[in-house]
């Protein structure tokens, strides 16, 4: 009993000290100073935000008082708040006029511009006047998780890990990635300066009150605080991007919350508001299989790696950024003054024709803070596969997406074959077990694939397209070295759709000779390639020597330099690795009439040799990228990115936005089909754009 009495007296003494301190503080603040302070806050548009934050603090304190988990200091503060509330109620009539001018009374103060002196122990208030004379619209469109600390005064500080110590990353849901900072108690304001001709801009407020005006400041803040649950690409400074924009869906006949079955870190939903059909069954793959480095016998996986500590921002020290710049400079006219292209704050504003080299597994840079790791992090946006009115299945975004944002990759099975000048009409079947591929009757002219014909009623998501030049080098003012050998093309195929990738060549090596020998062993029956699981490799055959069925053809003109590629039929079992079986040694070509048709990006302007053709087949295995439709005015562009290997034949095919995309908009890209190239295969384009070319294949 005596201990309880002593403790109660001690607590009452603390209350008295707190009350006395508050009284002294109130005496030091004059009415004129208070009115001037609130005028500044009103002009800066901070009143609403301060009261919203105050309400969050009060709710937490309220809950702690109810469940008995409050600390002694929090009990004291609760009593002080109650006393002040009673006093405020008594003085309401007297101060009504003054309070009405200031709009509302607030508790928190903005952090001072100089914040490099004190430690960051208090995480609540704001007192920064960097947007004085402006109007702010606070964009808090989701439930904010407030700090667990009570309402305490804020002092100048040096930002560090303690600024975000109260954020629990495990509680963050898989939602709009641009909404994650708001869920972590950041505030997003739309700021417009009064009487200024400048347009509105976006301003972020960190939980400790620090203002973040652009992506550079965001990166600095995340680096100083050691934040590993937010990236600079989670922040958008575009006024066109609205965090509260969401897609409103009508009555769904068929729906699926995640067609990836938890393969992707973010669910890929499916919605059909038109009929009761579903997409054809396929195996969902997060990335293409097999990895490029395994096809290359694990040789020359990475040319260089870095050990940056600044987030890989300095091209003079980052080896990976230098690889991108060096490849780009080989095809750039230095007199044009075009600087190296690449990621800027984890966004890509325009395509890099020579490819991007991301930091790899051998690099020692921080995976979260590194600005040169984007595609390898996988799908981050909330995408939905939906049934369109006229084009079959398509893909749309469920939230606003900023310009230059990575959307997804095009994943599938990598198929290999050899284009041998001695083989005029046949190709090795992709299945070693002897599955017959249906022979295709149609043929095309030089450099065109022999494709099976499609009815005009088929959707864009099912059409076949030949994509010769994914990037317009002329639009970038580049001087392109045309490749002499153009027999080999790399293609993507989704259903019946094929996408040509610009090939990257290098001279024949010992590795390629070993690969040739392996293919000969497969042909002779010494080993086979199965397509049952990812872990399986070449295994001894169960039967004697088998011949491969020639279900696909290379069509060759009379000119030996002009060779056409064969089309892998959708009905064939084409979801495994397949190789060629050359009967004579490939020859290097330095001149070809095909140069006039297709500009190629090569690793060097010197002579190049024929190598294997690599096909990315998404007909039976793939990801959400296989559902992307064509548009003559697309909102996506294609970019080659080297992630798991620097071998030129195996880039990842990534899609990035070329503008701000609003929630519910279908995501499309241009197949780049040149009208008249394959007139027999052309069908009507249904993109509906004003610049529509009316024909695709």
Curated annotation (Swiss-Prot):
A cellular component term, taken from the record's GO annotations: chromosome
Comment field on protein domains: In the pre-SET domain, Cys residues bind 3 zinc ions that are arranged in a triangular cluster; some of these Cys residues contribute to the binding of two zinc ions within the cluster.
Keyword annotations from UniProtKB, A to Z: Cell cycle, Cell division, Chromatin regulator, Chromosome, Developmental protein, Metal-binding, Methyltransferase, Mitosis, Nucleus, S-adenosyl-L-methionine, Transferase, Zinc
UniProt subcellular location: Nucleus; Chromosome
Gene behind this protein: setdb2
Residues annotated to bind Zn(2+) 4: 632, 685, 687, 692
CDD domains reported in the protein's UniProt record: HMT_MBD
Name this polypeptide is given: Histone-lysine N-methyltransferase SETDB2
A Pfam family recorded for this sequence: Pre-SET
Annotated binding of S-adenosyl-L-methionine, by residue: 391-393, 626, 629-630
